[in-house]
Every structure is written in C-alpha cells, then in structure tokens.
A protein has these predicted regions:
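Short, highly charged C-terminal tails/helix-capping segments
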Residues: 137-146
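Short, aliphatic-rich beta-strand segments
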Residues: 101-105
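A short acidic/glycine-rich loop-to-helix N-cap element
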Residues: 109-122
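Long, contiguous binding/interaction regions
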Residues: 127-132, 136
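Long, continuous compositionally biased terminal/linker segments
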Residues: 33-68
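Short, internal acidic amphipathic alpha-helical interface segments
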Residues: 57-100
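A short interface-forming secondary-structure element
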Residues: 65-68, 107-112
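Charge-rich, low-complexity N-terminal segments
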Residues: 1-45
C-alpha cells in the first residue's frame, strides 16, 4: 500500500490537526505557532509540508526556507549540519539555485504503511528542530552565525 496525501489528510483529521491540502502543489501544509523559531519573514510560525514522492513510496516532511542562508551560506549550512548530527530523523538540505535552506524528515514506506503516530512524530521532529536550531543560525545576540 503506497502512502497517499488523502490517507495522510485522513490521519491528520483523526488526530484533530488542522491542515490544508494543496492539490495543485501536491502537498499538505500544517502551520504551527512557535516559541522561539522565527521564519524568514520574522514570524513565529513554522509551516510544515507533507509530501508523498516517488508514487507514495516515501513520506517527506519539510519546512521550506526554514532559515535564511545569510552572507555565508556554507557557514550557515555547516552550523545546521552540526545541529542535525545530534538530532535523530531530521536533516538539512540546501538548494543553492533558489537559496532554499530546508529542514527535512523522510521515511521509506514502499509497500508498507505509515501509522498516524509515525506521521505526527515526523512533523513534530521537524518543528522541534526548527525551534532548537534557531540559536545555531541566529545566536542570542541576533546576528547571523558566521
């Protein structure tokens, strides 16, 4: 059984998680109010996207443009990779063409399934990583990490 966004939306509804299914974008978005994390617009919001790439053989949860790369994108990526090394399940990806620094959690589903608990754990892990890693990118003094 491949993973589908319809199945994912059903699981989120059963867990009473408010979400938006973007049919055109082929993703589900879940918005969280955060304690410390600020998105690149300065809002205390994390927008997690759930996708089912490879014909539903994987479940992928991301926060796109999670952090601004800053003047030194390599240093920012390195700081986040160091933070990721201590965090199970969550990684960092950088798309230099569009300067998209994203947080990502993926699970291989193949012909198995994904439980509601597993899905919620992936979403929670990405959002909690954004909260915790905020200081890796923007230290307490407010300046970008170098």
């Amino acid at each position: 059984m491949a993973f589908s966004l319809e199945y994912c939306a059903e699981m989120l509804s059963k867990a009473r998680v408010r979400h938006h299914v973007d049919v055109e974008g082929n993703v589900i978005r879940v918005v969280f109010v955060t304690r410390h994390y600020r998105n690149i617009r300065g809002e205390k919001l994390a927008i997690a996207q759930i996708a089912a790439p490879d014909d539903g053989r994987r479940c992928r949860v991301t926060i796109e443009r999670a952090f601004a790369p800053g003047q030194d994108a390599a240093a920012t990526c390195l700081a986040l990779c160091r933070a990721a090394s201590d965090t199970p399940l969550v990684g960092v990806e950088f798309d230099a063409e569009c300067e998209n620094l994203r947080l990502v959690a993926e699970a291989v589903v193949e012909d198995g399934g994904l439980t509601r608990r597993q899905l919620l754990s992936m979403v929670d892990s990405v959002v909690e990583a954004a909260e915790a890693w905020q200081v890796a990118v923007v230290p307490r003094d407010g300046r970008a990490a170098a």
